Amino acid sequence: MSTKINSKKLEMFDLLKKFIDSKQNIFFLDYRGLSVSQLTDLRNKIEGEHGALKVVKNNIMKMVLKEKNIDVVDSCLVGPTVVVTALEEANVIAKIFYDFVKTTTLKVKGGFVLGEFYDEAKVQAYSKLPTKKESISLFASVLKAPVSKLVRTLKALADVKN
C-alpha cells in the first residue's frame, strides 16, 4: 500500500516550516471562542510589533517541529491552535496577547523563548518584564541619580557658604 501525500498538506508543511524558520520566540495559543474580527485585531497588533500570527493544523505543526528538532509539550498542540512568532522583543508580543486574554476567551498554551520551553505561567511572567526601551530608561535613571545627588549636595554646600 503506497502512501500518497496530499499536496495541500505538503504546501502547508512548507509554509509552516518557513514561518518558524530561524525564529527563537514561538508561542502557542488556543483561539477557541474568538470571533474573526478579534483574531484579525490580535493579528494586526502583533504584526505592528514585528511579530506574526498563523492558525495551524496541530499534526502538521508537530511534523514541522519534529523536523526542526524542537521538542514541544503535547498539550501545546491540542485543540484550535494559533502560532505566534516574535522577531524582536518577544515580551512585547506576549503583553499583547495577555491583554487579549483579559477580555476574550484566548488562552496561552506555552511557547519557546530563545529556544527554551516556557509553560503558560512562565510566559505570563515573561510578559510582565519591561521592554527594551523601558529597561534602557530605567538604567539611565539609575546612572543619573548619583550625579544628580552630587550636584544637589554641592549646590547646598555653596548656598551654606554664601
Swiss-Prot record:
User: Which Pfam families does the UniProt entry name for this protein?
Assistant: Ribosomal_L10
* Gene Ontology MF terms in the entry: large ribosomal subunit rRNA binding; structural constituent of ribosome
CDD domains from the entry? Ribosomal_L10
Q: List, alphabetically, the SUPFAM superfamilies matched.
A: Ribosomal protein L10-like
Q: Which GO terms describe its biological process?
A: translation
What cellular component GO annotations does this protein have?
Answer: large ribosomal subunit
Q: Does the keyword Magnesium apply?
A: no
Record bears the keyword Ribosomal protein: yes
Instruction: Recite the UniProt keywords alphabetically.
Output: Ribonucleoprotein, Ribosomal protein, RNA-binding, rRNA-binding
Q: Where is the signal peptide?
A: none
Tell me which NCBIfam families the record gives: PRK00099.1-1
Q: Which family does it belong to?
A: Belongs to the universal ribosomal protein uL10 family.
> What binding partners and quaternary form does the record give?
Part of the ribosomal stalk of the 50S ribosomal subunit. The N-terminus interacts with L11 and the large rRNA to form the base of the stalk. The C-terminus forms an elongated spine to which L12 dimers bind in a sequential fashion forming a multimeric L10(L12)X complex.
Q: What does this protein do?
A: Forms part of the ribosomal stalk, playing a central role in the interaction of the ribosome with GTP-bound translation factors.
Question: Which PANTHER family does the record cross-reference, listed alphabetically?
Answer: 39S RIBOSOMAL PROTEIN L10, MITOCHONDRIAL
Protein name from the UniProt record: Large ribosomal subunit protein uL10
Q: Which organism is it from?
A: Borreliella afzelii (strain PKo) (Borrelia afzelii)
